[in-house]
């Protein structure tokens, strides 16, 4: 019987979502790749299958309740096996000063960063509770812990997601569901930074960004933890990062 995983918030292949999908597939899980852009989703699915892994692509909007429910319904009914791991990786690190900010901007950042996490977390728990086991992991950021002048909307969303994860862990941990929150305290060495803002990537250097391999190792470590020694929150940063 196969083990299934859902990764929500998959963008470029050389990003955290893509790296997580490829790592889980290499470990033998059937990965449901969920993202907004069909072309990126299908390209990643093809790469996983070409490497001998199992993957199913689902283009969806994590802020739409019906999309999230449909994703979980498909994961449960597509193939044999059980859904054992769900990762919520969606987020929009949009910057802006409060006095110039439209309410619609703040709401959209919150919807992706927090509301989507609620919808995904709720559906994961609903499907896992009858079995009394499963793992739900949320991707956090520096802004999960503290707000800065230009992170008003992003920090509010990420702090909300962190509180959601804490509430879920305390409510459902005793029922066998492991809920974890990963604080990524630094830039990620993926396409969004390396190709999107190359000057910043060059200034930080290879040792100044969090490696994708290191991140996927950490998520896999959390997933494989025994019940007698669960971690709820894990923070990761390059050794050069001040904190």
Located regions from the model:
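Active-site loop of short-chain dehydrogenase/reductase
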Residues: 2-3, 53-54, 81-83, 97, ...
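C-terminal helical subdomain
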Residues: 174-186, 199-243
